[in-house]
């Protein structure tokens, strides 16, 4: 019998009294939600008033659970979920799994421990199990399809619950816990897939890209090419060149050591860590010294803070860790070298950057079966930052133009072009509302890279992009869901209907996590 099943009442109740209550029977196997109706007869040997108290307590369980669920749902609803965020994507995936919810009441109690079989792996890396005749979803992190796990519910909504992972009762065929290298895995929110072999991680990330375009682009399947295999990272551990552990300080300050580390999965609290296996070896070597220095000043902090740790190459080929946001970092891959402020954005997996940028350049120049004379001659790098793609993809073009709204970023892009002997690149500071106004290259001979932040492109930028209408667009994104949304918008507009999607491929810049970098190529069909 499932642990949540309500205890049968056999003690003194008034004659003909009827009690309605939920009885969830063996959800894992039968997945049936039954409304049980029982008749109880008075038992002289037990005080009636005591049984009445038990009756009220039992009959209020479902009502109390639902009140709490509604209260929490309303509280969460007040905070709008950002479109394309992990939370937003998870809700959409749950909606697709539960097409027609029919449950009138939440079938569980908050903080209840349950057993559940995981059926799906979400794009956010969390497992999803369906219970109550597939009408209610339970989201459990650090799980895989086929796992039967024990989980503790900490958030209840009308159609789903969020749970803490407690233990594996029966593992999936895909689970291999001997692969786990981090002592904090299954508590820290940084990684999701350490128990999954790397080839299966890549396969899952391909599925994420497929689902994103299926559900987010709103494009007919005939307009979408088959998704290419995800390109793996040469390093699956010790690849991350930047980490940002943080700490909180309670009101009134702290008298003891600070808890410094990363956010615990499903909680708004920081967990103490002493190492991070996905960070570079240099960062892990320096980590204890940096933390010790912060701890020595613990009583001086009046509020929490984030600690920057960025791996930087030195001129003699060695590495150091930079913690000052304003200091200059040196990044090197292949024959290329870049400098930028430690607090600025730059891709955090050095080991895959050569493959990554080479593929982008191929996409910019690839004729895709079209006539050779249609190959682009000019390259515009929007969101150019410190010039990563402008410099790495410059060969083969008559000229390269990097556009950026930050004057500081443009200055570093110019320095990086000079450092790498790129003579055909120029960089301009553009205004957000007229980003392409200074570009004079003929659109039908121009290829463009766009690499926006996680939230994707705003409406103004997309409209300007359609107005300029370059021959080719290579859209790079760290959030495939906002990428799919933006591409769907572009192709739905009158000026965007002349574009065709040539290729979509994921790159694994963050092994062991659910994140996937997606590169999509659009080409204007010219008769």
UniProtKB/Swiss-Prot annotation:
The keyword Methyltransferase appears for this protein: yes
Transferase listed as a keyword: yes
Annotated [4Fe-4S] cluster binding sites: 182, 188, 191, 276
GO molecular function: 4 iron, 4 sulfur cluster binding; metal ion binding; tRNA (uracil(54)-C5)-methyltransferase activity, S-adenosyl methionine-dependent
Domain of life: Eukaryota
Domain TRAM intervals: 107-167
Entry protein name: tRNA (uracil(54)-C(5))-methyltransferase
């Amino acid at each position: 019998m499932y642990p949540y099943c309500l205890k049968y009442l056999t003690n003194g109740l008034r004659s003909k009294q009827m009690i309605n209550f939920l009885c969830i029977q063996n959800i894992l196997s039968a997945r049936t939600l039954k409304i049980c109706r029982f008749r109880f007869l008075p038992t002289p040997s037990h005080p009636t008033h005591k049984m009445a108290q038990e009756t009220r307590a039992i009959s209020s369980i479902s009502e109390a659970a639902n009140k709490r669920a509604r209260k929490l749902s309303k509280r969460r609803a007040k905070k709008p979920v950002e479109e394309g965020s992990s939370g937003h994507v998870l809700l959409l995936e749950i909606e697709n799994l539960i097409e027609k919810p029919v449950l009138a009441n939440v079938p569980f109690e908050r903080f209840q421990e349950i057993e559940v079989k995981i059926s799906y792996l979400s794009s956010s890396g969390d497992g999803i199990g369906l219970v109550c005749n597939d009408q209610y979803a339970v989201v459990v992190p650090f799980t895989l399809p086929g796992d039967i796990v024990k989980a503790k519910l900490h958030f209840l909504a009308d159609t789903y619950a969020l749970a803490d992972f407690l233990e594996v009762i029966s593992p999936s065929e895909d689970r291999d816990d001997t692969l786990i290298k981090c002592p904090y895995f299954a508590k820290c929110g940084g990684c999701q897939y350490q128990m999954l072999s790397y080839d299966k991680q890549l396969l899952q990330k391909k599925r994420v890209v497929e689902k994103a375009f299926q559900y987010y682009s709103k494009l007919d399947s005939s307009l979408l090419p088959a998704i290419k295999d995800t390109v793996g990272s040469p390093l699956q551990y010790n690849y991350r060149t930047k980490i940002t552990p943080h700490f909180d300080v309670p009101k009134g300050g702290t008298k003891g050591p600070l808890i410094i580390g990363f956010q615990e999965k499903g909680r708004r609290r920081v967990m103490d860590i002493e190492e991070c296996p996905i960070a570079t070896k240099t960062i892990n070597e320096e980590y204890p010294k940096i933390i010790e220095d912060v701890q020595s000043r613990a009583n001086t902090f009046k509020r929490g803070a984030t600690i920057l740790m960025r791996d930087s190459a030195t001129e003699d080929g060695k590495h150091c860790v930079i913690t000052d946001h304003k200091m200059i970092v040196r990044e090197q891959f292949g024959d290329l070298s870049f400098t930028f402020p430690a607090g600025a954005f730059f891709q955090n997996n050095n080991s895959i950057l050569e493959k990554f940028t080479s593929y982008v350049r191929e996409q910019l120049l690839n004729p895709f079966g079209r006539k050779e004379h249609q190959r682009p001659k000019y390259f515009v790098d929007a969101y150019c930052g410190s010039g990563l793609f402008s410099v790495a993809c410059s060969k083969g073009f008559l000229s390269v133009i990097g556009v950026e709204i930050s004057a500081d970023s443009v200055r570093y892009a110019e320095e990086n072009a000079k450092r790498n002997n790129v003579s055909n690149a120029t960089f301009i500071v553009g205004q957000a509302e007229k980003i392409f106004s200074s570009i004079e290259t003929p659109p039908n001979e121009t290829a463009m890279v766009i690499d926006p932040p996680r939230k994707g492109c705003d409406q103004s930028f997309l409209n300007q992009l359609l107005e300029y209408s370059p021959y080719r667009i290579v859209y790079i994104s760290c959030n495939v869901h906002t990428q799919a949304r933006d591409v769907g918008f572009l192709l739905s507009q009158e000026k965007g209907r002349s574009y065709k999607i040539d290729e979509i491929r994921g790159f694994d810049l963050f092994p062991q996590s659910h994140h996937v970098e997606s590169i999509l190529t659009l080409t204007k069909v010219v008769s």
